[in-house]
A protein has these predicted regions:
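NAD(P)H-binding glycine-rich loop region in Rossmannoid oxidoreductase-like domains
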Residues: 5-10, 16-62, 70
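A conserved pocket-lining segment of Rossmann-fold NAD(P)-dependent short-chain dehydrogenase/reductase
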Residues: 105-107, 157-175, 179
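Substrate-positioning beta->alpha
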Residues: 118, 150-151, 168-189, 195
Length: 294
């Protein structure tokens, strides 16, 4: 299902049937789901700035309500909801977040995270109350080729474009995009209805990530760590300046956070094997270079 205004460069070579419509249109969703045995819901607004909560709610929550209703109306066999790791509480490197952790990131005041959490809870409620054949996958920060927009690949491009590289004090879990795709397939084949599965690769601080990027790319850079209090102060100023600021309190909070997870449950139950993050970075670098992003 593709909205009429979508940029489809990233999928032109995929042999698939497409349906033109919008996920926030109940009529479009009902028509798109008709005749499907399995539905994968991966669409959402992921931008962390310049978006009102009403827009997040419409695309991330209300659309999920429409899609689950359509799945039940058309008696689909399986529904895979692609959520985010941040609906699950993160942890440290020594004790990373797992599927038993509750939601703890409400303090981040992120419209994206909050709307995804509400949508995930709605899916799980429909599983319990109305027998929706739903399974949730929770990918971490995805890296790899074919990032047309780019989305998460902006972090790599940022690391390539600066001789003096300022980086935040926190860290996160990085996962190869192909491992996430494989995780979705395995969830269809092996996942248990009503369960959540973190799709989580390797935990790295931002300093470790950029040093790895520096080594793989061969770039010569001076790296400077930004103190947390400086970043958070700048984030507060950005929030006061309005929704257009790329750095607001929510993004600053997340950049300072130890945002670490484990994918052991998906390794055990979905039989996933995670690719080293070096391969994900190398694949992204090669693709960006071939397509003239740098």
């Amino acid at each position: 299902m593709i909205r009429p205004s979508a940029d489809v460069k990233g999928i032109v070579n995929i042999p698939c049937e497409t349906f033109s419509g919008s996920i926030d249109s109940n009529t479009d969703v009902m028509q798109a789901v008709a005749g499907c045995d399995i539905v994968i819901h991966a669409a959402c607004i992921t931008e962390q700035w310049g978006v009102s909560f009403a827009a997040y709610e419409r695309a991330n929550f209300t659309a999920t309500q429409y899609i689950t209703a359509a799945c039940m109306a058309h008696h689909v066999e399986k529904f895979i909801y692609v959520s985010t790791a941040n609906t699950i509480g993160p942890g440290s490197k020594n004790n990373p977040g797992n599927e038993l952790n509750g939601f703890t990131l409400f303090n981040a005041n992120s419209g994206y995270i909050n709307s995804k959490y509400l949508a995930q809870q709605y899916v799980l409620e429909q599983v319990a109350a109305r027998k929706l054949p739903g399974i949730v996958v929770n990918p971490t920060f995805m890296i790899g080729p074919n990032d047309v927009k780019p989305s998460s690949g902006q972090l790599i491009l940022y690391g390539l474009q600066h001789r003096l590289l300022f980086y935040p004090p926190g860290g996160k879990n990085f996962v190869h995009i192909r491992d996430v795709c494989q995780g979705i397939i395995r969830a269809i084949e092996r996942g248990r209805t009503g369960d959540c599965y973190l799709l989580a690769g390797q935990n790295l601080s931002y300093g470790e990530f950029f040093r790895l990027l520096k080594r793989i790319s061969g770039k010569r850079q001076l790296m400077v760590k930004i103190p947390a209090f400086v970043l958070k102060a700048a984030g507060i100023i950005g929030s006061l300046a309005g929704t257009g600021s790329k750095l607001n309190y929510s993004t600053a909070y997340m950049l300072c956070l130890d945002n670490y997870y484990t994918g052991k449950k998906s390794e055990r139950e979905l039989q996933l094997r995670y690719t080293p993050v070096e391969a994900a970075i190398s694949g992204a670098l090669d693709w960006f270079k071939e397509n003239n992003y740098f």
